[in-house]
Regions:
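Lectin-like carbohydrate-binding module/patch detector with strong preference for beta-trefoil
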Residues: 1-176
Length: 176
């Protein structure tokens, strides 16, 4: 058996060459929906400060429409949909945490935008073994909320980036 090997019809001989394993295909959307359902119970619909996991002095904030790390402790209200995705709504601006342009690629900016219930505004709060949370984008299971350059400092930009498990992608929620 090798890649690009020919398949042909042949009389049964009960060899491994004639044994098949069928794997159920699950679409990327279905995989994300399953993940959202799995982690749905870990988060309550209420208001939080979204803090950096390793440095409580910094949290998710905004400057105009852009989202960045700051020491302002801005409040975000979490709402859930029927599938299990969460949406962050900034209490001050009533705008949602949104992936700019709905593009799931490295370094795509995250900003605040009018709530529109799109996948660009939906997240999965995946609980990590160390107790932190990683926010997976509903656009792509491999892209998560990330602090640009891994620098946890005031006014550092927040973006979408491929999941790499670093502290720049770990957060904690403090209930208000």
């Amino acid at each position: 058996v090798s890649n690009f090997g020919n398949v042909q019809i042949y009389k049964s001989n009960n060899t491994k060459a004639q044994a098949w394993n069928f794997i159920k295909y699950e679409s990327p959307r279905s995989q994300l929906d399953s993940m959202a359902k799995k982690y749905n119970a870990d988060i309550q619909e209420t208001t939080y400060v979204v803090q950096c996991y390793k440095n409580n002095n910094y949290s998710l904030g905004s400057s105009g429409s852009n989202v960045q790390i700051s020491n302002s402790n801005q409040k975000w209200r979490i709402k859930k949909d029927s599938v299990g995705y969460i949406t962050f709504i900034n209490v001050s601006t009533n705008k949602a945490l949104d992936v700019y342009g709905g593009h799931s690629s490295n370094s795509t900016n995250v900003w605040q935008y009018n709530y529109n219930n799109s996948l660009a505004q939906k997240w999965i709060a995946k609980k990590n073994s160390d107790g932190s949370l990683t926010f997976v984008s509903a656009l792509d299971k491999n892209h998560v909320l990330d602090i640009s350059g891994g620098l946890i400092q005031n006014r550092q930009n927040v973006q979408l980036y491929q999941n790499n498990g670093t502290n720049a992608q770990k957060f904690k929620l403090t209930k208000i």
